[in-house]
Design a protein with these regions (language model features):
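Extended repeat-based scaffolds of very large eukaryotic assembly and lipid-transport proteins
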Residues: 2-168
Length: 168
């Protein structure tokens, strides 16, 4: 691999250096991930990066970004692309990494709160099972992993499972 952590330096140039391991999407202390794709009919910046990563990166490079990139927002973006390409494999990684305590500022419209990356991923998968072709078996595997996770109280979906009045 090259210094950016990717196997193809052309890919890094093609997506405006977002794949460099030390570059977050924004130069600030708090990295934000936007849950909504559009806001006031303009596509959010991260989803433009998402389109570029999807266009120029191989599946292996997307997996590498999801697992190893130092930007948590890029981890999330790459995970969503991985989920589109291979839902079973992405869910297996989600379960393997469920105790990850890294946080992001998850923003929906203009409201944002710090949330664990595991929680954001679980909510993404469980809310969009049909969109990403996640099997019932994989969904049940996620439920079991959440219930047995060491950091289950940091995963919003845990409360959905334990309180019938909660919603994703």
């Amino acid at each position: 691999t090259d210094s950016s952590g990717l196997s193809n330096p052309i890919v890094t140039n093609s997506i405006d250096s977002i794949c460099e391991l030390l570059k977050p999407i924004r130069d600030s202390k708090v990295e934000r991930v936007y849950i909504d794709e559009y806001y006031l009919s303009e596509k959010r910046e991260q989803w433009i990066y998402s389109d570029s990563i999807e266009k120029y990166c191989t599946k292996e490079e997307i997996i590498q970004l999801a697992k190893e990139h130092k930007s948590r927002a890029i981890n999330y973006i790459a995970f969503t692309l991985w989920l589109k390409k291979d839902p079973h494999e992405a869910v297996s990684y989600l379960i393997e990494d469920i105790n990850n305590n890294d946080t992001l500022c998850a923003v929906k419209l203009d409201e944002g709160l710090p949330e664990s990356l595991s929680s954001i991923r679980v909510n993404l998968v469980q809310r969009n099972r049909a969109k990403y072709n996640v099997s019932i078996e994989d969904s049940i595997r996620i439920d079991k992993a959440v219930m047995n996770a060491k950091n289950r109280k940091a995963i919003w979906y845990y409360y959905v499972l334990t309180d019938p009045q909660m919603d994703i």
